[in-house]
């Protein structure tokens, strides 16, 4: 797992062309937050500075919110830095249908207008229902 995160961190640094201090990693609650923190640490090991890290809770942004909300545990979104004009890397642990990422993008846009939103996922399982494609993938798992 550590090797995969290091490889993803190197790819993020190379492809974005930005210093770590210019990047914002935003993890999707729940699984994406830990991945975002670990990616930030791996980037800091490469760049000697860490990117900012935040988190979004997408419970209210889901397209099935009306049916899912009675059982949903809504947590806080924590983006405590400006994202206007910044490079934001949305981070999740697993990408499959794309619906979670669509909701996460909507949530991020409520905080401002980033220059660009990248997508990093630890596992890409395929099975898309929406046109979502990750920029950085740890491992691809066929379902």
At which residue positions do the language-model features occur?
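PRPP-associated nucleotide enzymes
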Residues: 1-143
């Amino acid at each position: 797992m550590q090797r995969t995160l290091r490889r993803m961190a190197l790819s993020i640094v190379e492809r974005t062309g930005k210093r770590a201090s210019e990047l914002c990693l935003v993890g999707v609650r729940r699984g994406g937050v830990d991945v975002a923190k670990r990616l930030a640490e791996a980037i800091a090991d490469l760049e000697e500075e860490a990117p900012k890290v935040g988190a979004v809770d997408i419970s209210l942004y889901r397209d099935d919110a009306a049916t899912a909300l009675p059982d949903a545990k809504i947590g806080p979104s924590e983006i405590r830095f400006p994202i206007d004009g910044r490079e934001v890397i949305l981070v999740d642990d697993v990408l499959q249908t794309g619906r979670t990422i669509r909701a996460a993008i909507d949530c991020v846009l409520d905080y401002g207008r980033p220059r660009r939103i990248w997508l990093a996922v630890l596992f890409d399982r395929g099975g898309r229902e929406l046109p979502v494609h990750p920029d950085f993938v740890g491992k691809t798992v066929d379902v």
